[in-house]
């Protein structure tokens, strides 16, 4: 298995699909990386030689991926919460922060329903 940015790329996957296993690299960015490294997108990961892997590693290193990106996202959410703005307040309360309705729905963000003592 090829190892790029601390992630094992599956051997039997095309390199474009394998690059998407790295957090922060989607379909478009994976294609751009392959073009910049002069590698055909439909090449299997097991068919790459060491020079091609080094070229891919150099291209991926130009982007913020994996741990650094996760840390940046976490820090920006923490900054919003410390600032006390509306979005930070919604993050702190575990509610949607992009204007969705919450009277019904929003179960993913709010979690499972809490039981309320009913009348008997």
UniProtKB/Swiss-Prot annotation:
One of the GO biological process terms: translation
Q: Which GO terms describe its cellular component?
A: cytosol; small ribosomal subunit
What InterPro entries does the database record attribute to this sequence?
Answer: Rbsml_uS13_C, Ribosomal_uS13, Ribosomal_uS13-like_H2TH, Ribosomal_uS13_bac-type, Ribosomal_uS13_CS
Keyword DNA damage among record annotations: no
- What are the alphabetically sorted keywords of the record? Ribonucleoprotein, Ribosomal protein, RNA-binding, rRNA-binding, tRNA-binding
Where are the residues of the annotated region Disordered? 96-120
Q: Name one GO molecular function term.
A: rRNA binding
Family annotation (Pfam families): Ribosomal_S13
Family to which this protein belongs: Belongs to the universal ribosomal protein uS13 family.
Quaternary structure (record)? Part of the 30S ribosomal subunit. Forms a loose heterodimer with protein S19. Forms two bridges to the 50S subunit in the 70S ribosome.
Q: Mind telling me which NCBIfam families this protein's record contains? A: uS13_bact (TIGR03631)
PANTHER family found in the cross-reference section: 30S RIBOSOMAL PROTEIN S13/40S RIBOSOMAL PROTEIN S18, SMALL RIBOSOMAL SUBUNIT PROTEIN US13M
Report the protein's function: Located at the top of the head of the 30S subunit, it contacts several helices of the 16S rRNA. In the 70S ribosome it contacts the 23S rRNA (bridge B1a) and protein L5 of the 50S subunit (bridge B1b), connecting the 2 subunits; these bridges are implicated in subunit movement. Contacts the tRNAs in the A and P-sites.
Q: What is this protein called?
A: Small ribosomal subunit protein uS13
Q: Which organism is it from?
A: Neisseria meningitidis serogroup B (strain ATCC BAA-335 / MC58)
**Lineage summary:** Bacteria, Pseudomonadati, Pseudomonadota, Betaproteobacteria, Neisseriales
